[in-house]
């Protein structure tokens, strides 16, 4: 059995098996500030501004926001998104405005068309897929791993992931929730 869980490179890797997936790859930027005294006890998300922030053990603020808005495999970001993310952060927490930015980077996100992941077997015997986690991939790793391990070990989906089937896109059974998937109607 082979399990494919490679995030933003899923489409590229699975194309080598002649699979065309309902995924788009986008850059999601993240930022880290200088070390500060404890300010944020957990993770704070701001849906209206599409902003998230937490504080590392070393005191740096780790934050980010929306995808760059175009398909890309580049692992770098642009200044326009930096400005957008910082505006969202300042709208939520004006006190972070004096923190100095130390670094920024971009990671590739595999975005499903309905904003929900795919945890399923493929039409190729012994090949299983865990993809399309959009913005929540790293945060969802424990539950994702649990459900994917169940599928690989037992051959059928865990009850928590039984709706995350690959064929839902072909059959028109997209998951109707506030997922933040790609927006193919805008491309």
Which functions belong to the PLM regions below?
Residues 4-19:
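Flavin (primarily FAD) binding-site architecture
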Residues 8-9, 87, 143:
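Alpha-helix/helix-capping structural signal
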Residues 13-16, 42, 73-74, 139:
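Short glycine-/acidic-enriched loop or helix-start segments at secondary-structure transitions
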Residues 21-27:
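Short hydrophobic/aromatic-enriched beta-strand-loop microsegments
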Residues 35-126:
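Active-site lid/adjacent beta-loop-alpha segment flanking the redox-cofactor pocket in flavoenzymes
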Residues 48, 90-187:
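C-terminal catalytic lobe of FAD-dependent flavoproteins
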């Amino acid at each position: 059995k082979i399990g494919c869980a490679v995030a933003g490179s899923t489409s590229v890797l699975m194309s080598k098996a002649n699979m065309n997936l309902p995924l788009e790859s986008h850059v999601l930027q993240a930022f880290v500030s200088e070390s500060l005294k404890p300010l944020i006890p957990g993770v704070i998300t701001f849906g209206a501004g599409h902003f998230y922030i937490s504080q590392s053990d070393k005191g740096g603020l780790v934050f980010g926001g929306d995808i760059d808005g175009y398909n890309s495999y580049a692992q770098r970001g642009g200044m326009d998104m930096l400005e957008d993310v910082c505006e969202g952060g300042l709208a939520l927490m004006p006190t972070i405005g004096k923190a100095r930015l130390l670094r920024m980077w971009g990671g590739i996100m595999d975005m499903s068309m309905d904003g929900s992941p795919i945890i399923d077997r493929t039409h190729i015997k012994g090949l299983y897929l865990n993809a399309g986690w959009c913005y929540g991939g790293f945060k969802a790793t424990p539950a994702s791993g649990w459900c994917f391990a169940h599928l690989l070990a037992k051959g059928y989906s865990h009850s928590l992931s039984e709706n995350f089937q690959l064929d839902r896109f072909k059959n028109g059974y997209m998951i109707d929730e506030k997922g933040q998937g790609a927006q193919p109607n805008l491309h």
